[in-house]
Amino acid sequence: MIGLSTYRNLPTLLTTTTVISTALRSKQLLRFTTTTSTKSRSSTSTAATTVGNSNPKSPIDEDNLEKPGTIPTKHKPFNIQTEVYNKAGIEANDDDKFLTKPTYRHEDFTEAGVYRVHVTHRPPRTIGDKISCYGTLFFRKCFDLVTGYAVPDPDKPDQYKGTRWEMTEEKWMTRCIFLESIAGVPGSVAGFVRHLHSLRMLTRDKAWIETLHDEAYNERMHLLTFIKIGKPSWFTRSIIYIGQGVFTNIFFLVYLMNPRYCHRFVGYLEEEAVRTYTHLIDELDDPNKLPDFQKLPIPNIAVQYWPELTPESSFKDLILRIRADEAKHREINHTFANLEQWQDRNPFALKIKDSDKPQPNYNLDVTRPQGWERKDLYL
C-alpha cells in the first residue's frame, strides 16, 4: 500500500513530471526549429552566390553592383573637376517632385534640322562689331587656358591624349555648366531693361521682351539638365558666383548705353557655344572617346522640356538639341543687332501673311546663321 505521505506528495510529483516532460518537448522543438533555420540560411546564401555570378562558390562582390553616386575617377589633392553621376546616381538625383510644365514651350526640332546646324562666323563690319568679336575671343581664350580646353587638329584626333588638354567627361561637364550659368544672364538682363523702358516710356516693346525671356529660360534649362548629370566642385561654384556678379553688372550698364553692342556680343558668344558643342558631338561620334557619356541616360527634366526626346534618347541626342538652341540664339541676337533698337519690331514673333519672302521663325526650317539683314525684313 502507498503511504499517506506519498498521497500528500503526489501533486508535487505530478507537477515535476509535467515540467520535465514539457521541457523535453520544448528542447526537441527548439532543436527542430534551429536545424530548419540553419538549413534555410545556407540555401539562401547558395542562391545568392549563384545568381549573376559565374562561380557559385565565390561570394557576391557587392561593390560591383551600381549604387547611386558618381563615376570613379582619379582624385587629385586639389580636385576641381565636376563629378559625373553614374546611371543610378542620375536616377536618384532626378527629383521630379513638384516638377511643373515649362513656362515657355520648346519648338519641335526635326532630326534633320538639328543635324543641319554647323559652325559659322559673321565677319565684324563696324567698330562695335570688332569690339564684341575680339572681346568674346579674348574671354574664350582665357577660359580655355584655365580649364585646359583645346580642339585637336582634324587629322590628329588623339593629339592631346594623355595631356592636360585632353577633354574628359568631368572637364566637359565643368565647361558646360559654367558656360550655361553665364549664358542665361544676357536674355534676362536685356528683357529686364526693356521691361523698365516700356513702363517708363508708356509704350509697347513690340515682342522683344518675350523672346529675350525665352532665351534666358532656355539657357537655364540647359543648366538644370547638366546639373542632373554632373556635380560641380566647390571651385566651379565659386567661379560661377564671381562670374555672374561681374558679368551681370557690366552687361546691364553696357546695355543701358548701347544695346546693339550687347546683342552682337551675345551673337558671337553663341557662335562659340555652337563651336564647343560641335566639338563635343564629334567626340561622342568617336567610340574610343568619352565612354561614360555613351551609356548615360538623360534626366527626366530634359524629356519634359524637349518634346522630341524620350527616356530612351541618348546623351548625344540631348547635345544635338542644345546645340540647335544655341544656333537659334546666335541667329536671333545677330538679327537684333541689325535692327533699330527702340523702333523696330521683333521679326521672330510674328509671321506676316500673304508674303512669299522667307521670314524668321523660332524653328530650324528657315535660318540665317549670321543674322537677318534689316533690308530683308518686314518691320
UniProtKB/Swiss-Prot annotation:
Main location: mitochondrion
Cofactor field: Fe cation
UniProt-annotated binding residues for Fe cation 1: E180, E219, H222, E326
Segments of this protein annotated with the region Disordered: 33-76
UniProt source species: Candida albicans (Yeast)
Residues involved in Fe cation binding: E180, E219, H222, E271, E326, H329
Family: Belongs to the alternative oxidase family.
Low complexity composition bias: residue spans: 33-50
Keywords: Electron transport, Iron, Membrane, Metal-binding, Mitochondrion, Mitochondrion inner membrane, Oxidoreductase, Respiratory chain, Transit peptide, Transmembrane, Transmembrane helix, Transport
Gene Ontology CC entries for this record: mitochondrial inner membrane
Chain positions recorded as Fe cation 2 binding sites: E219, E270, E326, H329
Cofactor note: Binds 2 iron ions per subunit.
Keyword Transmembrane in annotation: yes
Protein topology in the membrane: Single-pass membrane protein
TM regions (residue ranges): 234-256
Name of the protein: Alternative oxidase 1, mitochondrial
Role of this protein: Catalyzes cyanide-resistant oxygen consumption. May increase respiration when the cytochrome respiratory pathway is restricted, or in response to low temperatures.
GO MF entries: alternative oxidase activity; metal ion binding
Biological process, per Gene Ontology: alternative respiration
InterPro entries: AOX (IPR002680), AOX_sf (IPR038659)
Intracellular or extracellular location(s): Mitochondrion inner membrane
Enzyme nomenclature, EC number: 1.-.-.-
One family name in Pfam for this protein: AOX
